[in-house]
């Protein structure tokens, strides 16, 4: 009996010794030393397999996706998709070469072209609401224009940093492709799809609200341009939507991209006309009207307006991935946001000094009737030409989330086998256009809607989520001041988001209760 016990104890001790030697050998092997014996090498291989299973096994539920028959991609070419499915890119040299070749076939853009895209996003027509923000914020509103530029530039950079990780060789490689991938990585392994769904919902809300704002501003501008005509603002919005209804038939953005230059030209013409008129009245500028105190009830709305005018984080991952030199991304973000900060600050201040307490939600409504009609026609043209971009993006997110996820889709595919859109899918697109019209008719308040959207989704996508994801994914690599910045942005963003949302909602309820048209 004693011999049997000694034998078992000896076997257990030998097993434990072998495992410990294998772990030590594995650790040394990672540090560059070779294993001493074949047994230790075998133990290290086993430990490495266990380590791989430990790191990847928790995500097996999102890796088990069905690859459709037919054009099945090769194993080395499968990447993380928008919803977080698919295998992560391999670290092998052959597959890395394949990915480089495939990426080289894509049209690459320069840092200047990327900066132009960011500038178009953050220098859009929504800057027309910034003088209204100065009305309720005074000098603090000007400070917030600068502060929001700094924070949005920083959060854009850390959002891109979340796309990368260090491999075993210490090299930084891109392992994620989109905002949704980052969100899914943060919520894995317990809720591998929750983060992506939250980001998708926020994106859809922001894109649809942007479409609604375009319809609202079109109806508002046309009504104020021709006040003598017996046509109400709602009727102008209906006519604008009738022009926009063909957007439901869009298959891609090739037909829309040619109008982007016209949008930019129209925007510069509008800014030049407004600033030229303001400069012509420089002698009457009311410097004494710029307050150092704030309207506690209205100022949170101003925060939402300012934040919404800087939103660009949605498309930054795709933009950075298509740059010829991604290392220039940080420099591009710096000069685009510096330029935006200067131009927005000057535009808002000059416009407010001209009209002071009479500043309206859309600053062009303050212009004389003769100039206003010309400027507003340019604005309406820009709004109508800009509508297809967020509309198509919202449709794409909805289709991929609800109709094109294979076995996980909530509804059947809205495209037929020949790639054509089914009739009921077209009906849903038309319904989305009509929905933007109904919202514009029943909530025709440009600044309040802009503040509501900026406080809800703008602050979330630009402030809260990037800082939270940065802390979650890169906690071990962050320095103390980076942690401080992220936590501060998250706390301040949360306070501004909640207060702005509540006060914007109160403003909408008040405007609706008192039947305020503008």
UniProtKB/Swiss-Prot annotation:
Domain of life: Eukaryota
Membrane-side (Cytoplasmic) residue stretches: 1-125, 219-258, 320-334, 398-431, 476-482
Annotated signal sequence range: none
Cell location: Cytoplasmic vesicle membrane; Presynapse
UniProt GO MF annotations: gamma-aminobutyric acid transmembrane transporter activity; gamma-aminobutyric acid:proton antiporter activity; glycine transmembrane transporter activity; glycine:proton antiporter activity; L-amino acid transmembrane transporter activity
Cited InterPro entries: AA_transpt_TM
Sequence ranges on the Lumenal, vesicle membrane side: 147-197, 280-298, 356-376, 453-454, 504-518
Pfam families assigned to the protein according to its UniProt record, in alphabetical order: Aa_trans
GO terms, biological process: amino acid transmembrane transport; beta-alanine transport; gamma-aminobutyric acid import; gamma-aminobutyric acid transport; glycine transport; neurotransmitter transport
Annotated catalysed reactions: 4-aminobutanoate(out) + n H(+)(in) = 4-aminobutanoate(in) + n H(+)(out); glycine(out) + n H(+)(in) = glycine(in) + n H(+)(out); beta-alanine(out) + n H(+)(in) = beta-alanine(in) + n H(+)(out)
Membrane topology value: Multi-pass membrane protein
Regions that span the bilayer: 126-146, 198-218, 259-279, 299-319, 335-355, 377-397, 432-452, 455-475, 483-503
Protein's UniProt keywords contain Transmembrane: yes
The family this protein is said to belong to: Belongs to the amino acid/polyamine transporter 2 family.
Cited function: Antiporter that exchanges vesicular protons for cytosolic 4-aminobutanoate or to a lesser extend glycine, thus allowing their secretion from nerve terminals. The transport is equally dependent on the chemical and electrical components of the proton gradient. May also transport beta-alanine. Acidification of GABAergic synaptic vesicles is a prerequisite for 4-aminobutanoate uptake.
PANTHER family registered for this protein in UniProt: AMINO ACID TRANSPORTER, VESICULAR INHIBITORY AMINO ACID TRANSPORTER
Protein name according to UniProt: Vesicular inhibitory amino acid transporter
Protein source organism: Xenopus laevis
Taxonomic path: Eukaryota, Metazoa, Chordata, Craniata, Vertebrata
